[in-house]
A protein has these predicted regions:
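Cofactor-pocket helix-loop regions in the catalytic cores of large enzyme subunits
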Residues: 1-167, 171-174, 186-363, 402, ...
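A residue-level signal for beta-strand positions that form part of recognition/binding surfaces
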Residues: 120, 380, 397-401, 431, ...
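Structured loops at beta-to-helix junctions and adjacent beta-edge loops in soluble globular domains
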Residues: 126-128, 162-164, 373, 384-386, ...
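C-terminal segments
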Residues: 145, 479-480
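C-terminal beta-rich recognition modules with glycine/proline-rich loops and embedded aromatic residues
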Residues: 364-368, 395, 480
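Glycine-centered loop/turn motifs
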Residues: 377, 447, 470-472
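Non-catalytic terminal/interface segments that mediate subunit docking, oligomerization
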Residues: 377-424
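Short, solvent-exposed secondary-structure boundary/capping segments
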Residues: 467-479
Length: 480
């Protein structure tokens, strides 16, 4: 477990982890804080923030050069570019990683031995890995580690991203990425045009922009209008001051949401949407399980499900979107996304969801991927060196490292949970956790309101002293 306080972020996954632990599974947690997951662990690596990549590279060094614990058969038969990886790891000893990570070399060695020994080892990670300067490289290094030990393509192995919401996987499957169409077909590919033009007609084939590029475009004026649906970037995106400047610089802003969020307050037009209890459709979760959801309550007067709003907007713009139901839309998805082709609403209801790929009506679904081969044929080892600048250096003006994360009673920006009195009662305001030694040095006391200032901005929060984090670090939940 790396980069995830699963007890607060994914409580159902945490329940499975605790059950596996009771059955004898070994648990390793990499987290700067001593969270409930860390307390449960056989090994807790209280890493120095920002240094996940150095740790993963050191683990592979131990497995490869000291323990000879790599899966040579898997490497030879299923992967490529292994020699480049091997050369890049030669100097990544535990002694090299120790001053970077703050970990003892023997703890790194013990972790490497336990993971490689298996016989089945699985890695779960979340935003503590991805939302860092080295996030992409660390994900690549984790994929290297999995392939190095052959821990993929069979039950109880693999590399599992714990998604931030219940349909992140489904959104990506349906093309909510800048470079792909539904089914992960490149937008500018011949296959993409062949597959989708027959349903949609001609369409633009250039790749879209990444979220950071969109925000930059709003500020520099190259993007003049935006349509934001189910998103609250005024609270969820980094550097709120720059986000607000970009949104205010637009000529026209549409926001489609279920509540009046800080982002919606800046909109020229608000399209009131229905909540998840008021619509039908599917969610696809982190294990690629497509699950049917049913309408529990009718939408409130003046609101509509997202799919209906989108159809109405398309038709108003002169397009054609004459769908009558989510079922009809799903049937179109089945035509153009082969991994969904064997599913229908009846099967999803009867079988309590199916994991894609499910290419035919008689296919049982696929509980785990890459059993015989990878999508590209062979798995590609990549070189992921640790950069000189990790983006989190402290100095005299900013002597603390800020950690962010969730609490169990709030969900993302709190748009929904702050409207539940029972949930909001537990965490009604922002708080800052600080080690007692640091609080004493600054002559701060529990329950005082303090101003936390970074290079990007500041926030007022109520102080809590906590011994579950390291001196020199502070923790702030990102719901506020």
């Amino acid at each position: 477990m790396i980069g995830s306080n699963t007890s607060a972020q994914h409580p159902l996954a945490y329940a499975r982890i605790t059950a596996a632990k009771k059955r004898g599974a070994k648990l390793i947690t990499v987290d700067p804080r001593r969270t409930p997951v860390a307390t449960l662990s056989d090994i807790h690596l209280a890493i120095r923030p920002g240094n996940n990549l150095a740790l993963v590279n050191a683990l592979m060094h131990v497995i490869l050069f000291e323990e000879k614990g790599q899966d040579d058969a898997f490497i030879n038969e299923r992967t490529e570019h292994f020699d480049a990886l091997r050369a890049s790891l030669e100097g990544c000893t535990p002694e090299w990683a120790a001053p970077l990570t703050g970990l003892q070399p023997e703890a790194i060695r013990e972790t490497a031995r336990l993971y490689a020994k298996g016989p089945n080892s699985i890695i779960l990670y979340c935003m503590g890995v991805t939302q860092q300067v080295t996030g992409t490289r660390t994900c690549g290094a984790l994929a290297n580690l999995v392939m190095l030990c052959g821990m993929i393509g069979r039950p109880s192995t693999g590399l599992i991203p714990l998604r931030g919401q219940n349909n992140v996987q489904g959104s990506c499957d349906m093309g909510a990425l800048p470079e792909t169409l539904p089914g992960y077909v490149k937008a500018d590919s011949e296959l993409g045009h062949q597959r989708f033009a027959r349903l949609w007609g001609p369409f633009a084939d250039e790749q879209g922009k990444k979220l950071t590029e969109i925000m930059d475009g709003m500020r520099d004026g190259s993007i003049r209008a935006a349509y934001i649906m189910g998103e609250n970037p005024m609270q969820s995106d980094p550097d709120a001051a720059k986000v607000e400047a970009g949104l205010r610089n637009l000529d026209f802003l549409i926001v489609q949401d279920i509540f009046m969020t800080p982002t919606a307050r800046l909109a020229d037009v608000i399209l009131p949407a229905a909540s998840y209890l008021e619509k039908q459709g599917t969610f696809t979760n982190t294990e690629r399980r497509v699950q049917l959801i049913n309408e529990v309550l009718p939408p409130l007067p003046g609101t509509r499900p997202d799919w209906r709003i989108l159809c109405d907007v398309i038709n108003a713009l002169g397009g054609r979107a004459d769908y009558d139901s989510p079922r009809e839309i799903f049937n179109e998805i089945r035509q153009v996304v082969p991994s969904y082709a064997g599913m229908d609403y009846t099967r999803l209801a009867e079988e309590q969801g199916l994991c894609w790929p499910c290419p035919t009506p008689d296919h049982p679904g696929t509980p785990y991927l890459h059993a015989a081969s990878f999508t590209r044929g062979r798995g590609l080892f990549t070189v992921n060196d640790v950069p000189d600048d990790l983006g989190c250096a402290t100095d005299e003006t900013y002597p603390f490292t800020l950690l962010t994360g969730r609490v169990s009673h709030h969900y993302h920006t709190g748009t929904m949970t702050r409207r539940s009195w029972a949930l909001d009662r537990e965490y009604p305001e922002a708080f800052l956790d600080m080690h007692p030694d640091d609080a004493a040095a600054l002559r701060l006391k529990d329950n005082w309101k303090v101003r936390v200032t970074s290079r990007q901005g500041s926030i007022v929060a109520r102080l809590r002293t906590a011994t579950d984090l390291q001196p020199g670090t502070v923790f702030l939940p990102f719901h506020f």
